[in-house]
């Protein structure tokens, strides 16, 4: 009996691994494959935030024009000080390309919408955030902790069903880019989502999307 149980568990683990690998293989450009109609922004090497083709073209143009929009002799922000009428684009904290204010607003909006523009946000790799759930007959409470985030950034949490990511809540990273201790993200209700659900994390300071584990809070109501 014990040998049969061990064999069954091994078979199940193998099937799960095969399923996971197949899911990754199904995405033509890896875990950050964009949904139809979107492409990578490419504001810097490794920038895989999904945007419209027009915004990627605009981003490339901003790179070309960036040097001409800096104060030639520097200023209060050093050599990256922008001329009057321009601001840093800030697709991430170190992005000091000088652009019109509308372009910075666009970059912030694109970061905030990064999850919904991925083909499968639940296929993204594990990041520095972990989650845990305290369960109850009516659902449960989702808590998160972690590091490696943008300092002072808004950190958003989603559940990843097969159709559309559902927003669960948000936290704010501290000055070191961490979520100290176990902080409550949301109170979740049974029968209100996929079960179990993959939790997706968005670092809004960079638009980076990762996963943080799963929750059983959406279990069938008792």
Feature annotation, model-predicted:
Residues 1-24:
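Secretory targeting and sorting signals
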Residues 31, 47, 54-59, 63-80, ...:
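Extracytoplasmic/secretory-pathway segments with low complexity and glycosylation-like composition
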Residues 35, 39-42, 88-90:
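Extracellular adhesion/carbohydrate-binding repeat motifs centered on closely spaced tryptophans
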Residues 25-31:
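Cleaved targeting-peptide boundary
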């Amino acid at each position: 009996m014990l040998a049969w149980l061990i064999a069954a568990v091994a078979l199940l683990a193998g099937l799960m691994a095969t399923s996971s690998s197949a899911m990754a293989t199904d995405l033509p450009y890896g875990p950050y494959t964009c949904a139809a109609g979107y492409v990578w922004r490419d504001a810097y090497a490794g920038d895989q935030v999904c945007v419209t083709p027009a915004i990627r073209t605009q981003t490339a143009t901003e790179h070309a024009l960036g040097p001409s929009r800096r104060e030639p002799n520097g200023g209060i922000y050093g050599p990256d000080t922008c001329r009057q009428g321009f601001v840093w684009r800030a697709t991430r904290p170190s992005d000091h390309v000088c652009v019109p204010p509308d372009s910075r607003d666009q970059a912030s909006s694109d970061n905030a919408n990064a999850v919904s523009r991925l083909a499968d946000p639940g296929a993204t790799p594990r990041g520095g955030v972990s989650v845990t759930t305290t369960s109850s007959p009516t659902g449960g409470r989702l808590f998160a902790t972690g590091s490696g985030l943008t300092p002072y950034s808004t950190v958003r949490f989603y559940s990843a069903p097969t159709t559309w990511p559902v927003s669960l809540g948000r936290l704010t990273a501290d000055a070191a880019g961490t979520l100290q201790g176990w902080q409550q993200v949301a109170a979740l209700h049974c029968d209100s989502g996929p079960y179990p659900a993959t939790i997706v994390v968005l670092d809004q300071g960079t638009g980076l999307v990762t996963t943080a584990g799963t929750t059983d809070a959406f279990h069938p109501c008792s």
